[in-house]
Amino acid sequence: MIQVLLARLKQRHRTMKYPAAPPPEMPDRFRGRPLLAGSKCPEGCRACADACPTGAITLDPELRLDLGKCLFCTECEQACPQNAITCTRDYRLAVRKRQALILAPDQAELELAAALDTKSRRLFGHSLKLRQVSAGGCNACEADVNVLGTVGWDLGRFGIQMVASPRHADGLLITGPVTENMKLALRKTYDSVPAPKIVIAVGACALSGGPYRDHAEVQNGAESVVPVDLFIPGCPPHPLTILDGLLRLLGRLDESKT
């Protein structure tokens, strides 16, 4: 036991200071919010739309990109001969309205998630218990949600915890495209959470079905089964993107430090 204590003393404090301090630097391979330069698109070019594996890009009447469907695979960026699509380093992607994830040309920022109303923040602002439902996910989004519980992120310091039963929860955190076999289970889980409650959809699959969209055995995301209060896109979203969304929902972010 003494060796454990000595090792802990030597390691010192490992939890990052964010959001009280600036966020950690994102890795070189990180791909954040895309930026569209529609003016660069030559007439009749469909290179980006044809390259997109999920149909996230539309060109009529102008270039649009649906982040709810986007896998951040950069196939469109690589396919575009005019560099009309580039990925920024902006990790802030969470929104309250699904429609807010549809990017227009030269759109500088998303309409980022607004905080819950005052009554809800009083209930959940310092103690939010979530039941995580993997509705047919591949475990990538689940893994990055799990990362938030490690010592580096320490999700519990914000009063946010994952619980084992929906009856002990304030809401649901849903991953996966919602397979046919999980549709009823998700609905029953939602009904078991006491009101008032919130629902958070994490990852492209939970937002739109992701690469499985329109398959006969999936529901194209959580919103087709239960109402959703927060949408966090990505495949999978970075832990910082997930944390940013949760803190925005609870009104616990100082914008000057993000």
Task: Show where each model-derived region lies.
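Flanking helices and flexible, charged tails adjoining ferredoxin-like Fe-S electron-transfer domains
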Residues: 1-16, 21-23, 78-165, 218, ...
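Fold-independent oxyanion-binding glycine-rich loops
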Residues: 39, 67, 88-90, 104, ...
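Long C-terminal interaction/binding lobes of large macromolecular proteins
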Residues: 208, 246, 256
